[in-house]
Design a protein with these regions (language model features):
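Glycine-rich phosphate-binding/hydrolytic loop that grips phosphoryl groups
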Residues: 335, 339, 356-392
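Short glycine-rich, Thr/Ser-proximal phosphate-binding strand/loop in the N-terminal lobe
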Residues: 4, 13-60
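Oxyanion-binding "anion nests"
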Residues: 248-251, 255-280
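Glycine-rich phosphate-binding loops at beta-strand->alpha-helix junctions
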Residues: 325-347
Length: 392
């Protein structure tokens, strides 16, 4: 048949992978090639099988990075001609009320207009997703193009967890409700955890944590999302690298008075808050380094983050009636920082979760009857698998 390009455009990065559709159908998960661009360090990493190359790159835009990645794929003979690419799937966070499907949505003129109309629902991620998708449509004009929205996974949440306690017309007429995010990761991790636990996907109960630059939690009952920490936008919930997380709405007028405009306040809350706002560093590794050097605010920021995650775990255990099959962790912090994970789970022995004293790793074998799993997030593969079902 052909090849699938899977694109995950973040606020300052792009992750792309190219897959052979026959290989995916045969159960192979390794892409033909992978590309990752990080704007802040001006580097692009390319992987072809076991070979990995890091390149210094001068460009600033997501479109340039996308084109660079495609050119490198082509030079490495991952594909020769544009018509070999039959499908392109782009991760997007939130397209609004009308684009709430857990499955990939084919991009039509109407879908594109609706997505553009709701671009501000995820101000850090939606704009680059739109930018790269448009570039891909021009380059691979003969292919089918899809968006896969994070929020679709959470469309199964009960109405009580979607509503805010505002006048009902805010929900019915304005469309203000909790959409959530990180849905592609959560959907994939639910499938993978159920397989590992040998539990039917429609019966598995999980607490999912995605802890990286963006952080959130998700309660899953009988294989469906029932609650999540992110809300109308991905700014809500846990504190994150540059996002403030939950905040009293009563402070908003004061912030507008201080910063001068709503636009500036939104920029501060999404791009200059969280760990960055408290410490000047967005990366947990650098925040920990500051803490080790005696920076009091860095220590406070880490303690606050750990406490927020602990509170959510407790709340979701109660929401799931303490019938939890596993806690599943993903994201850069969860996948690489076992010390932070260990501090998060300390004290949960009383509800059946017990971690080994060996602080070098956390695996399900080291726990009591509620295992903690660390699963590496792979949104690109999850999207490729999902979109393949739409085209075969």
């Amino acid at each position: 048949m052909g090849k699938i390009v899977s694109i995950n455009a973040g606020s300052t990065s792009i992750k792309m992978a190219i897959y052979d559709d026959f290989a995916i159908q045969d159960g192979q998960t390794t892409p033909l090639a992978e590309y990752r661009w990080e704007k802040d360090v001006k580097k692009a990493t390319v992987k072809f099988g076991v070979h990995k190359y890091v390149h210094d790159v001068p460009f600033e835009s997501h479109t340039e990075a996308f084109k660079d990645g495609i050119n490198r794929f082509k030079r490495a003979k991952s594909f020769k001609y544009s018509n070999e690419i039959i499908t392109v799937v782009n991760r997007a966070v939130n397209g609004g009320e009308l684009l709430q499907s857990p499955d990939p949505i084919e991009i039509t003129t109407e879908v594109q207009k609706e997505f553009e109309r709701n671009i501000d629902l995820a101000p850090n991620h939606n704009p680059p997703a739109l930018e790269v998708s448009k570039a891909a449509q021009k380059l691979f004009y003969g292919a089918k193009h899809y968006y896969m929205f994070d929020t679709g996974w959470h469309s199964t949440m009960p109405i009580m967890n979607q509503l805010y306690a505002l006048p009902k017309e805010c929900f019915e007429e304005v469309g203000i409700r909790a959409f959530g995010a990180h849905g592609i990761v959560y959907m994939d991790n639910t499938k993978r955890a159920a397989q590992k636990l040998n539990i039917s996907e429609d019966k598995v109960n999980l607490i999912l944590l995605h802890l990286g630059g963006g952080c959130s939690a998700n309660a899953v009952k009988n294989g469906k999302s029932i609650d999540t920490t992110m809300g109308y936008t991905p700014t809500d919930g846990l504190m994150m690298a540059t996002r403030c997380g939950h905040i009293d709405p009563g402070v908003f007028p004061k912030l507008v008075e201080y910063y001068g405009s709503v636009k500036k306040v939104m920029e501060v809350m999404t791009k200059k808050s969280g760990f960055y706002g408290l410490t000047g560093e967005a990366d947990m590794r650098l925040v920990k380094k500051l803490a080790e050097e005696g920076d009091e605010m860095a220590n406070v920021a880490i303690e606050r983050f750990i406490n927020e995650v602990r509170k959510v775990i407790g709340a979701y255990m109660a929401e799931l009636d303490y019938e939890v099959d596993a806690i599943v962790c993903s994201g850069g912090i969860a996948e690489n920082d076992t010390e932070i994970l260990r501090r998060i789970f300390e004290g949960y022995e009383n509800v059946g979760l017990s971690l080994s004293k060996d602080n070098t790793k956390i695996t399900d074998e080291e726990c009591c009857h509620i295992p903690v799993m660390v699963i590496q997030a792979n949104e690109e593969l999850a999207m490729a698998k999902a979109v393949l079902k739409e085209v075969i």
